[in-house]
Design a protein with these regions (language model features):
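ABC transporter nucleotide-binding domain
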Residues: 46, 67-82
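Extreme N-terminal leader/targeting regions
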Residues: 1-62
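Minor-groove-contacting beta-hairpin "wing" of winged helix-turn-helix DNA-binding domains
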Residues: 41-43, 281-285
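A short, hydrophobic/aromatic-rich structural module that often spans a beta strand
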Residues: 42-66, 178, 324, 354-363
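Non-ligating segments of multi-cofactor redox enzymes
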Residues: 1-23, 77-281, 288-290, 296-299, ...
Length: 363
């Protein structure tokens, strides 16, 4: 009997922010089993084939696939000097049988490689004939390319290779193949892999009321914690790490024009966007180690000043969040309460609102 991934609404950016345009899970699903709404997502039990591709595509891990329990798989894999993952539809043999090779995310693969564990991916040559192949092959390509991006920046000589056997080697599950030389690393065109995680452009975003944001406790994801293990390297990186759609992490930056509305911090599901304030000061901070690159902060930003940088720097864990924007608090001349304003003002927004209400009632 087929089961379907568990949906955890409080982690979903579409649930957290009603107007989110995130469609990563639906884009990754080759069976059109996912329905999107401003309440989140709904999975069709009839259409779902439990390939786990939707779960792998979700940066907040709102979808949990029981057919691919990542942490349990890693716990078994790290006990071996080498491990072969075989996709279930190919019926090939392997140490771990997974529903689709594309569901093995870059963080998992890079983590194993960083520990010197050689990884073989058996069954990729069957993608063209597989029921999951419509997006499974694209996702696999995306993840393998992301691993090579990591290898080029945080990797070292002890990193093991990730092999994709040719047809003749698939039964043995061994190969000296370098995946960077195959078609799996082609550049995508049209609605390509790099578009799967691209945030909505600011020009298409619409101002939204704060009631569209549902608050929930922040959380961390297993995939982001695996990435941070790789990022916490003692040596200085030779070059900044290029942002990549297969790496569920991002560095947020800000342009001039922040209104201190705090919508980004309210919508952020992981607590990467933070508001810190004292009696006299207000600050918007960003904690890179918590960011999964979901992009909801960019979507919800009403003045459209937040954006993702093209590169990521200072990857190691920092003792405190980086300051994106800071303001001094002002005191209202009428009610004497402290308030925040992007420009000097005599009275606070509450008193301004009272004045507007009074004027509308009495002219």
């Amino acid at each position: 009997m087929l089961t379907q991934p568990e949906y955890r609404a409080s982690r979903c950016t579409r649930f957290r922010y009603r107007y989110s345009g995130c469609s990563r899970c639906a884009d990754a699903c080759p069976h059109e089993a996912i329905e999107l709404s401003d309440e989140g997502v709904k999975i069709s039990a009839e259409a779902c084939q439990n390939c786990s591709l939707c779960a792998a595509a979700c940066p907040t891990e709102a979808l949990l696939a029981d057919k691919l329990p990542r942490i349990e798989v890693l716990k078994r894999a790290v006990k071996r000097p080498e491990v072969t993952f075989a996709c279930a539809p190919s019926e090939l043999q392997g140490n771990e049988i997974v529903p689709c090779l594309g569901a093995l995310d870059a963080a998992m693969l890079a983590y194993l490689a960083s520990r010197g564990i050689a990884v073989t991916l058996a069954g990729a040559q069957h993608c063209a004939d597989c029921i999951h192949g419509a997006s499974g092959e694209t996702r696999l390509s995306l993840n393998l390319e992301a691993v090579e991006v990591l290898r080029g920046n945080v990797g070292h000589e002890k990193w093991a290779e990730i092999s994709v056997p040719d047809e003749g080697d698939s039964r043995s599950g061994t190969s000296d193949h370098d995946p960077s030389r195959r078609h799996l690393f082609r550049r995508f065109v049209g609605r390509g892999a790099d578009q799967l995680t691209r945030p909505v452009p600011a020009s298409e975003a619409q101002p939204v009321p704060l009631k569209a944001i549902r608050f929930a406790a922040p959380f961390s994801t297993a995939g982001r914690e695996l990435l941070q293990i790789l990022f916490n390297t003692p040596q200085e990186l030779p070059t900044p790490l290029s942002a990549h759609a297969g790496l569920l992490a991002a560095q947020v930056a800000i342009r001039p024009g922040c209104t201190a509305c705090e919508a980004c911090a309210r919508a952020c599901p992981t607590g990467a966007m933070q508001v810190r304030e004292s009696a006299t000061a207000w600050q918007l901070g960003f904690e890179f180690t918590r960011c999964v690159g979901c992009g909801v902060c960019v979507e919800v930003c009403q003045p459209h000043v937040l954006y993702f940088r093209d590169t990521m720097e200072a990857l190691a864990k920092s003792p405190e969040a980086a300051a994106l924007h800071a303001l001094g608090k002002q005191r209202c001349t009428r009610c004497e309460r402290f308030f925040i304003s992007p420009a000097p003002a005599e009275i606070c927004p509450t008193c301004e609102g009272d004045d507007a209400d009074f004027a509308s009632l009495f002219g």
